Amino acid sequence: MSDNQSWNSSGSEEDPETESGPPVERCGVLSKWTNYIHGWQDRWVVLKNNTLSYYKSEDETEYGCRGSICLSKAVITPHDFDECRFDISVNDSVWYLRAQDPEHRQQWVDAIEQHKTESGYGSESSLRRHGSMVSLVSGASGYSATSTSSFKKGHSLREKLAEMETFRDILCRQVDTLQKYFDVCADAVSKDELQRDKVVEDDEDDFPTTRSDGDFLHNTNGNKEKLFPHVTPKGINGIDFKGEAITFKATTAGILATLSHCIELMVKREESWQKRHDREVEKRRRVEEAYKNVMEELKKKPRFGGPDYEEGPNSLINEEEFFDAVEAALDRQDKIEEQSQSEKVRLHWPTSLPSGDTFSSVGTHRFVQKPYSRSSSMSSIDLVSASDDVHRFSSQVEEMVQNHMNYSLQDVGGDANWQLVVEEGEMKVYRREVEENGIVLDPLKATHAVKGVTGHEVCNYFWNVDVRNDWETTIENFHVVETLADNAIIVYQTHKRVWPASQRDVLYLSAIRKIPALTENDPETWIVCNFSVDHDSAPLNNRCVRAKINIAMICQTLVSPPEGDQEISRDNILCKITYVANVNPGGWAPASVLRAVAKREYPKFLKRFTSYVQEKTAGKPILF
């Protein structure tokens, strides 16, 4: 036992010269991909004790980490295209990280690899430490571990080992007996030699016998046996050498037989273990094959939420999967909106309208409407003319309004190449396919006719930001950046993210105008013109792709005379709507996806918005 302990102790010692120092700890700010809504966010990352942890900021480290992963079996993969990005994956968990520049990325990757190497999966010193622990355990447990595991079902082998212990004791006793015999013999020989030497010295003075050749010869032959009688060692006469020999032969034969039996048992055990090993190998082969098939299937499907599958120049998602993902996200938004609308209807309580004059607010501008009579006309509405409001974008607004009035109201026939994509009742949606540098710039034109509302009412609800969230379901948030005039504002708005497409934002000037009629037969016309501008208060940001728009909502009111002397009611009015949209979405969304989404969403928008205006104006005085 002492030998085993000493061997284990020596084997567990490590060479201090080859033992490397602990890996260096590291901390700093990295951009981490949080989710498809918020995208990349700066996080305080700490690399310590083979663990990578991240916090929301350096000041919040005392509140605990937001997440951590062990680097023992982590796979670090620098990105192929993004020189600042690297991914860390452990089983199904993947962290997407970005450094400030390629140099910082390499420093982080090297530090993480060093921690991973020293974690026990790849370090020679770690392998030595693990081996030493195994040897200590095996040396300390001895036969007890063997008897409780490998020999749990092999009692015959243990019995044979006990027999060999008995044979060893017999052989040891025989060796002790022989050793005693040899020791006594050695003592007897030593005493005999001393006695012989003494007798020879006493007889040196005796006369020698004279031979015929004159030489002298001592007469010792006749007295030799008398002088040196045969000495027999005392105390060994009781040894039965023949019996000991028989016992020795039987003992060795028993040892050989027992060893043979032990070998036979071990061979049988080895065959049993070999069969179990073969079965486990076959199971492992089947599992690995199934795992390989699953991984191949997973490679075919996008990892939802990962930055590699979002919109971008190096996106791994194909157009079909891109469209499926966008369509699924839009369906979810529609369901949420339906639930929200049903909840609003359930909680809605009608409010009474005050009698007398009705006031309608358009921004901060006020219109006063008197009850309409046959003697009155549309020009009886007191309106501050839009041309009286002058601001730094006035010339651009005038140009945009004139262009839309000249071109947007033209017929879709001729050489314009307008394609009818949707037709539902009075609503028709046309499109012209235009691409520039791979970006879809399809102009869209829709015509619609809505009963019971005026063009002024439709444009009022379309322009007024106070009611924007009541009918617009695609906006995440918005705010008025600057009020240029009573009828012109600059608005910044961000649209809801539809994964895997990038989030879009828009900065645009919105102006509402009444277009004077050139003749008595011309219908009353209102227009809302929205077009992109630049403003210092809303610069570009990395979270959103800035879209460029040029949109016009042109509404003409047609009145059919009532019968007799009756006043005009909503049954006598019809609003003819022309909606024109020129949108540059930017980014890298596939053209087929953008066209499919536009074909789906624009008709839904017109129906939803016009239904909202009809609902809000029902039962209210007409606003011409």
Curated annotation (Swiss-Prot):
A GO cellular component annotation in the UniProt record: Golgi apparatus
Binding-site list for an N-acylsphing-4-enine: 472, 493, 530, 579
GO MF, any single term: ceramide transfer activity
Entry's localization field: Cytoplasm; Golgi apparatus; Endoplasmic reticulum
Motif FFAT per UniProt: ranges: 321-327
Origin: domain of life: Eukaryota
Domain START: 389-618
InterPro entries: PH-like_dom_sf, PH_domain, STARD11_START, START-like_dom_sf, START_lipid-bd_dom, START_lipid_transfer
GO biological process: cell morphogenesis; cell population proliferation; ceramide metabolic process; endoplasmic reticulum organization; ER to Golgi ceramide transport; heart morphogenesis; in utero embryonic development; intermembrane sphingolipid transfer
Modified residues (Phosphoserine): 126, 132, 135, 315, 373, 377, 380
PROSITE patterns linked: PH_DOMAIN (PS50003), START (PS50848)
Phosphotyrosine modifications at: 372
Main location: cytoplasm
Reaction(s) catalysed (UniProt annotation): N-hexadecanoylsphing-4-enine(in) = N-hexadecanoylsphing-4-enine(out)
Bias (Polar residues): 1-11
Domain PH intervals: 23-117
Record text about domains: The START domain recognizes ceramides and diacylglycerol lipids, interacts with membranes, and mediates the intermembrane transfer of ceramides and diacylglycerol lipids. The PH domain targets the Golgi apparatus.
Protein name as catalogued: Ceramide transfer protein
Organism: Mus musculus
Organism lineage string: Eukaryota, Metazoa, Chordata, Craniata, Vertebrata
Gene name for this UniProt entry: Cert1
